[in-house]
Amino acid sequence: VLLGLGLNRLFGPMGILGLTPLAVITAVTNSNGAIYTALAKEFGDNTDVGAIAILSLNDGPFLTMIALGTTGLAKIPILSLAAAIVPLIIGMILGNLDEDFKMLLSNGLAMLLPFNGFVLGANTSLFTIAKAGAGGIVLGLITVLFTGVLTYYLYSLIRRKPDPMGMAIGTTGGNAVAVPASVAMADPSLEPVVGVATAQVAGADVITAILSPILPGFFARRAAKRQQKN
């Protein structure tokens, strides 16, 4: 968010080299829940799997609207914020009211993972990278670096042990592609940058989908080697 704010302050809403503040903030405030869930089953524990409920808050335009509104980059009406978050809150409440219902859904998690992978792969196009250009590639790398690598070291510091699940946050969710248009509906002044921001976010989605499943394994192997030496 600070990176997007600095980009806007220095170069305005059109950004630099085609990389717009709207695209940056959208990409880094939306993660891919399907990738995180799959990686949590392999590299994490029950707390990591359960964290997806909280991480779902950044799936969609809510946090992007909060970031843009609080930094003054956009004027977001309260009703738009409510429309973005209320359905998710209702779903979280309903999912926690019935313990049997909760168990039913939790047991089905393993069945969902292969289908999540199929859907992710079917909707990932390398042509998207070409369309997004250098801006989309750079945005994907920024997302991995600023949300993945930094979160890895933060998680490791808090838990006092190497935690590869921090890298699983460094993704851009597929539904983030629709966020620039959603934000522009709340603040029409952003309409001129919606097209380029959408293409860049789509490019970042593909780049992070490729890198994110690889990097947690790399950090996990590196941590294991260090433990063996000690």
Language model segments and positions:
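Hydrophobic transmembrane alpha-helices of secondary-active transporters
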Residues: 1, 88-98, 106-132, 181-187
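Entry/N-cap segments of selected transmembrane alpha helices
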Residues: 1-8, 59-60, 124-155, 198-206
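Alpha-helical membrane segments and immediately flanking helix-loop junctions
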Residues: 7, 11-59, 161-199, 203-206
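Interfacial helix-loop-helix linkers and transmembrane-helix boundary segments
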Residues: 13-17, 45-46, 99-109, 124-138, ...
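Structural signature of hydrophobic alpha-helical transmembrane segments
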Residues: 15-29, 74-89, 134-146, 201-207
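C-terminal ends of transmembrane helices
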Residues: 34-44, 92-105, 150-160, 213-221
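Loop-centered beta-sheet repeat module
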Residues: 47-97
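Hydrophobic core segments of alpha-helical transmembrane domains in multi-pass membrane transport
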Residues: 63-70, 87-96, 114-122, 143-151, ...
